[in-house]
Every structure is written in C-alpha cells, then in structure tokens.
Regions:
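Terminal accessory/targeting
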Residues: 1-71, 77-144
Length: 144
C-alpha cells in the first residue's frame, strides 16, 4: 500500500471472553482480541478518522506517514461502548454507524435479532420458529 492509501476495518460484536459471555455462540471478537488487533495494527498503519478520509479522497495536502486504517463499527451495539473505551486508551477515533431503528424505535436491527436468536436457541430451533411464522402470515411458498 502507498502511504496516502487507506483501508477500513469494520467490527460488529466486541464480546467478553466466551466463558463470561451470556451469548458464547455469538460470533465476534473478544475484548482481548480487539485490543491485540489494535496493538498489531498501530505498528503498521496510521489510524485515521472519517474527516481524514474526506481529506484524502479530496486530494488535499493531507499526508499520511503510513497507510491509513479507518476503524468502524456497525449496528449500534452496546458492545461498542466497551470498544470506545479501548479506542480512547489508544488515542484512536472510531466511526460508529447506528441504524435509525435503534434511535427512533429503541429496537435492534433485524440481523442482530437473528444473530442473538441463533446464538441462544441454535439454528434448528430458529429455523423451525421462522417456518411457523411464515406459515402464520401466509408467506410460505408451498412449492418449496
């Protein structure tokens, strides 16, 4: 990578260690792994903000000493509060994308509901309940 190029690394779930996690089957990055990622990345990349990205893309006089790394988080999860404290310790600005359903309706995004349901009940139970719901609302194509 050239020095004024950048990549973006997106995180979703930043979880406690499996043995302490209420949802151990939820696929994600544990807090220690996240911290280790940042330590590894800081030696090879220059952490940048969305403002920096704007400057780079608009070919201003902005200059990076190393390739840039933008750290982002999707879905507006409570996990990200813990991640923000870690970012602050490293002096890194993260970009957090929060779905409008979280702020307007106080509800998680649909994929989050699915992920937690599968983590709690398993895929077979989830699919069984999903099929029942499809039948209840006449959404199941009987040919399938």
């Amino acid at each position: 990578m050239k020095k004024n190029e950048f990549v973006s690394l997106c995180y979703h779930y930043i979880r406690p260690k499996k043995e302490l996690d209420e949802f151990p089957k939820l696929l994600g990055t544990d807090i220690q792994q996240f911290t280790d990622h940042l330590k590894m990345l800081e030696g090879n990349y220059e952490f940048i903000s969305t403002r920096d990205v704007f400057e780079i893309l608009n070919q201003s006089s902005y200059s990076l000493n190393n390739p840039g790394m933008l750290i982002t988080f999707d879905d507006g999860l409570s996990d990200h509060f813990e991640a923000s404290k870690i970012l602050e310790k490293f002096g890194i600005k993260g970009t957090f994308f929060i779905p409008s359903c979280v702020t307007e309706n106080n509800l998680p995004a649909n994929p989050i509901i699915i992920h937690y349901s599968i983590a709690k009940f398993g895929i077979k139970k989830f699919l069984s309940e999903y099929e029942l719901a499809l039948k209840k609302f006449n959404l199941l194509n009987e040919k399938n």
